[in-house]
């Protein structure tokens, strides 16, 4: 899949789940199940409930996503 096929939206982490999964509420009100991108996992970036994050969604599955950035 090409990089320009993704949809990037901001959201707030609502819940931390097992296996580095998170429930994120997007700006438009939808709740998405997300995992952490590999680069964030490699650099030990911690994500806690309440953090504002950037999420990538694919056009094929809008209920799952990947957290690519945590805002300060």
Swiss-Prot record:
Protein location: Cytoplasm
Organism per entry: Nitratiruptor sp. (strain SB155-2)
Domain of life: Bacteria
Record-linked Gene3D superfamilies: Nucleic acid-binding proteins (2.40.50.140)
Keyword annotations of the record: Cytoplasm, Initiation factor, Protein biosynthesis, RNA-binding, rRNA-binding
NCBIfam families cross-referenced by the UniProt entry: infA
Function of the protein: One of the essential components for the initiation of protein synthesis. Stabilizes the binding of IF-2 and IF-3 on the 30S subunit to which N-formylmethionyl-tRNA(fMet) subsequently binds. Helps modulate mRNA selection, yielding the 30S pre-initiation complex (PIC). Upon addition of the 50S ribosomal subunit IF-1, IF-2 and IF-3 are released leaving the mature 70S translation initiation complex.
PANTHER family in alphabetical order: TRANSLATION INITIATION FACTOR IF-1, CHLOROPLASTIC
Name of the protein in question: Translation initiation factor IF-1
Quaternary structure, from the entry: Component of the 30S ribosomal translation pre-initiation complex which assembles on the 30S ribosome in the order IF-2 and IF-3, IF-1 and N-formylmethionyl-tRNA(fMet); mRNA recruitment can occur at any time during PIC assembly.
